[in-house]
From Swiss-Prot:
Subunit structure comment from the entry: Monomer in solution. Oligomerizes to an active state in the presence of the positive effectors ATP and maltotriose.
Keywords per UniProt: Activator, ATP-binding, Carbohydrate metabolism, DNA-binding, Nucleotide-binding, Transcription, Transcription regulation
UniProt DNA-binding residue ranges: 853-872
InterPro entries: P-loop_NTPase, Sig_transdc_resp-reg_C-effctor, TPR-like_helical_dom_sf, TPR_MalT, Tscrpt_reg_HTH_MalT, Tscrpt_reg_LuxR_C, WH-like_DNA-bd_sf
Positions with a binding annotation for ATP: 39-46
SMART domains: HTH_LUXR (SM00421)
Protein name: HTH-type transcriptional regulator MalT
Length: 901
């Protein structure tokens, strides 16, 4: 729940001097990306901007305090301020901020700018007291904000110091409007206006000018002088002499003498007690100070000029001027030290009564009241956890003694979930084991079941499915029906365990059950996870169309609940990319993989490994080996700098081995084969994939017998577990083994099986990557004209894709390739003495790829007669007499350059 006063622009007070010269400068603020108002405390920054903002509608105001260094809190308030300015235009961002469904502040801001693209009016966002921000992540995010904000948005920042927002760059590009302390300082005329409003009897212009000069136009000093002159008999001149040369850091003595010592004791105590509140209203004041009419007392303090200011138009919320508020809080610690814990307790109770547990926790911590803090957490901690107030919860739990946690195991569970959310798996088990050791009877009943549900989640995350299964079953046996969250967790874990064991039908049923429960109780991240798992299971079963439809349902959930920036969104777009790749929709597959990388842009690069492998698969299917090699360099660097799940390693190895196959790199394959993991089982698609990688490497090395043993065992497991997509892949690899071993009839038999199974899976690209050997077999089958209609149609489609694949695979004669070729030490002398034109190199590449003259003419969009001329010229330059000789010559050049052809 957001505190309204933090989003309210300060009310323009009576008796303030209208800063016409500065307002004139600010009138052009809409021409700048950033308006920066900087000065020490008390120069009137907030008052000036509140004057400028008066009458503007498209403006959001965000007043910071120390607690806004928490990223989630900063995001919530900033988006709320934008919503205030746009009348709720950015609904998606608002939901994402409220539910903490974003990967980082920068990704949230990126979504904000997408929504603001449809907002065409001038828009202003004011952030007051930015000097309170010390979190470097927020600074970096705000630099991103300024770089990418829409042209019609102006950010207005008020700060006591120069903020870390890339100011120099903005200044150079003339995108910065600056107002500093010298401009904020009162002029003689403004000082005279000020005193005329504040003093019962006017002072001479010369005297007000002298006072103004003596305090360098510092507004707070002028206000103190006027207050002192009203409260005492001595002149403003005398007060000015005392203030001359004093700055904000040396005001304490003056404020004691001239303010606190000149009010009655009741007012003094009111000021000191109320100052502990960062913002205050009638109910808070009544509870904290004991005054019966808090609103009336606040208005009275305001009339006395005691540095109290209204925070909203309703007059409900107030706060002290920051300078005066800090002074009062320090004095409160000295003068009311014995009462201070009780004052903070009263503040916490009042904030709780108004529904602001975060503020209540702030005061409970300040009071050092562990019992109060415990009670607040017992009632509100899980709500705060679900809203990602993780830093606040961690600080709160650390403040509680261990005995208090033991007396309230729910808080131990909360602390463990905090650790789990931060991937501190070892600490989770240590904490729960310690708690179980010290809490009587914890090993039985509901709490133990909740512990086990969490332990099960930790175990599956840590790659221990057997332990996860045991714990999840125990949890489900002991959990009452109403304990929905832990039941969702345990059911999801059990479904994932069965998935790992290859028991796909049972796993699918449990994931569907998880989805149903998660939707019922609005646990959206588990609903999303269960749908992704369902899609992956259906893919493994060979039901790719149903997997597609499940993915469509998942995308709908993401859009409805604004889950776009959860890391799980990357998982979804990645498995969508895998499906599109299987169907040879390569452009769409690549776009999906790139969108997955974008989702993970604010995470460690290692997290992008899977999507990068998918991009390499797309390059391989297109035959773009140069691009694949470039991407593989990055993938291998990531592999060497991270710890990954076996599924991730299997997918990374897959593209490496296929690349080695396409380039004939037997040395790399042999080296990998010596060191790679050889799983004990092959009962899921992760392990099947790794064993298939091993078999592919063995085939490349001519080790046909061990490869056949591997593939036959994989097929046996795949058939028994109904891993139909894996069976389809295995058959294709077995086909390649038989073909290369000269067992043509066996090769044809398994190819026919693979084509038949592809009617169910829809596979295309899995055939295509096997290249020319596959093309030869398909041509033979098509010529025999014995294939059933569906298989015939698929074979023709695959053949078309292979032709395109080989064109790209071998048409390397672009400018970069030719330049490298000409610089190669072994290049034939004839190439130097009779150089080919770039067009002739292109024609040679297409001849090698098997294109007829008519196809080459169509590809290059020239007349057939022109192509004949090019061919005649390149034959003459290469010293060849016919097409086959040209093909052999091109093949020699490619082999010389390291391409396995």
């Amino acid at each position: 729940m957001l505190i309204p006063s933090k989003l309210s622009r300060p009310v323009r007070l009576d008796h303030t001097v209208v800063r016409e010269r500065l307002l004139a400068k600010l009138s052009g603020a809409n021409n700048f990306r950033l308006a920066l108002i900087t000065s020490p405390a008390g120069y009137g920054k907030t008052t000036l901007i509140s004057q400028w903002a008066a009458g503007k509608n498209d403006i959001g105001w965000y007043s910071l305090d120390e607690g806004d260094n928490q990223q989630e809190r900063f995001a919530s308030y900033l988006i709320a301020a934008v919503q205030q300015a746009t009348n709720g235009h950015c609904a998606i961002c608002e939901t994402m901020a409220q539910k903490r469904q974003y990967a980082s502040l920068t990704s949230l801001f990126a979504q904000l700018f997408i929504e603001l693209a449809e907002w065409h009016s001038p828009l202003y966002l004011v952030i007051d007291d930015y000097h309170l921000i010390t979190n470097p992540v927020i600074h970096e995010s705000m630099r991103f904000f300024i770089r990418h904000q829409p042209e019609n948005l102006t950010l207005v920042v008020l700060s006591r110091n120069l903020p870390q927002l890339g100011i120099a760059n903005l200044r150079v590009r003339d995108q910065l409007l600056e107002i500093g302390s010298q401009q904020l300082a009162f002029t003689h005329q403004e000082a005279k206006q000020f005193f005329d409003c504040r003093l019962s009897s006017p002072i001479e212009a010369a005297e007000s000018s002298w006072i103004c000069d003596d305090v360098s136009g510092w507004a707070t000093a002028l206000q103190l002088i006027a207050l002192s002159a009203r409260q005492n008999t001595h002149s403003a001149h005398k007060s000015a002499r005392r203030l001359a040369g004093i700055n904000a850091s040396h005001l304490s003595d003056y404020l004691v003498d001239e303010v606190l010592d000149n009010v009655d004791l009741a007012t003094r105590h009111f000021l000191l007690k109320s100052a502990i509140l960062r913002s205050m209203n009638d109910a808070l004041i009544t509870r904290v100070t004991g005054e019966e009419n808090g609103q009336m007392r606040l208005e009275e303090i305001e009339r006395q000029g005691l540095f109290l200011q209204r925070m909203d138009d309703t007059g409900e919320w107030f706060c002290y001027h920051p300078l005066f508020g800090n002074f009062l809080r320090q004095r409160c610690q000295w003068e009311l030290a014995a009462e201070l814990p009780e004052i903070h307790r009263a503040a916490a109770e009042s904030w709780m009564a108004q529904g602001f547990p975060s503020e209540a926790i702030h005061h409970a911590l300040a009071a050092g009241d562990a019992l109060m803090l415990r009670d607040i957490l017992l009632n509100h901690a899980w709500s705060l956890f679900n809203h990602s107030e993780l830093s606040l919860l961690e600080e709160s739990l650390k403040a509680l003694p261990w005995d208090s946690l033991l007396e309230n195991p729910q808080l131990v569970l909360l602390q463990a979930w905090l650790m789990q959310s931060q991937h501190r798996y070892g600490e989770v088990n240590t904490l729960l084991a310690r708690a179980e050791h010290e809490i009587k009877d914890i090993r039985e009943g509901t709490m133990h079941a909740e512990f086990n549900a969490l332990r099960a989640q930790v175990a599956i995350n840590d790659g221990n499915p057997d332990e996860a299964e045991r714990l999840a079953k125990l949890a489900l046996e002991e959990l009452p029906p109403g304990w929905f969250y832990s039941r969702i967790v345990a059911t999801s874990v059990l479904g994932e365990v069965l998935h790992c064991k290859g028991e796909l039908t049972r796993s699918l049923a449990l994931m569907q059950q998880t989805e149903q429960m998660a939707r019922q109780h609005d646990v959206w991240h588990y609903a999303l996870w269960s749908l992704i798992q369902q899609s992956e299971i259906l893919f493994a079963q060979g039901f790719l169309q149903t997997a597609w439809e499940t993915q469509e349902k998942t995308f709908q959930l993401i859009n409805e609940q604004h889950l776009e920036q959860l890391p799980m969104h990357e998982f979804l777009v990645r498995i969508r990319a895998q499906l599109l790749w299987a169907w040879a929709r390569l452009d769409e597959a690549e776009a999906s993989a790139r969108s997955g990388i974008e989702v993970l842009s604010s995470y460690q690069p290692q997290q992008q490994l899977q999507c990068l492998a998918m991009l390499i698969q797309c390059s391989l299917a297109r035959g773009d080996l140069d691009n694949a090699r470039s991407q593989l360099n990055r993938l291998e660097n990531l592999l060497g700098n991270g710890k990954y799940h076996s599924d991730w390693i299997s997918n990374a190895n897959k593209v490496r081995v296929i690349y080695w196959q396409m380039t004939g790199d037997k040395a790399a394959a042999a080296n990998w084969l010596r060191h790679t993991a050889k799983p004990e089982f092959a009962n899921n698609h992760f392990l099947q994939g790794q064993w298939r990688n091993i078999a592919r490497a063995q085939i490349l090395l001519g080790e046909f017998e061990p490869a056949e043993i591997v593939l036959e065992e994989l097929n046996e497991n795949a058939r028994s577990l109904r891993l139909m997509s894996d069976l389809n892949r295995n058959l294709l690899l077995l086909n390649q083994l038989y073909w290369q071993a000269g067992r043509k009839s066996d090769a044809q038999r398994v190819l026919l099986d693979a084509l038949k199974l592809a009617n169910r899976t829809g596979f295309i690209s899995h055939f295509v990557i096997e290249g020319e050997a596959m093309a030869q077999q398909l041509r033979q089958l098509i010529q025999l004209n014995t294939l059933p209609e569906l298989e015939q149609h698929r074979a023709q489609r695959i053949l078309r894709e292979i032709n395109q694949h080989h064109r790209h695979k071998f048409a390397h004669f672009d400018e970069n390739f030719v330049e490298r070729l000409l610089n190669h030490p072994e290049v034939p002398e004839l190439i130097h003495t009779s150089p080919l034109t770039q067009r002739e190199w292109q024609v040679l590449g297409l001849i090698y790829s098997g294109y007829s003259n008519e196809q080459i003419a169509g590809e290059l969009e020239v007349a057939a007669t022109t192509i004949k001329t090019h061919i005649r010229n390149l034959y003459q330059k290469l010293g060849v007499a016919h097409r086959q000789a040209a093909v052999q010559h091109a093949q020699k050049l490619l082999k010389m350059m390291g391409y396995g052809v």
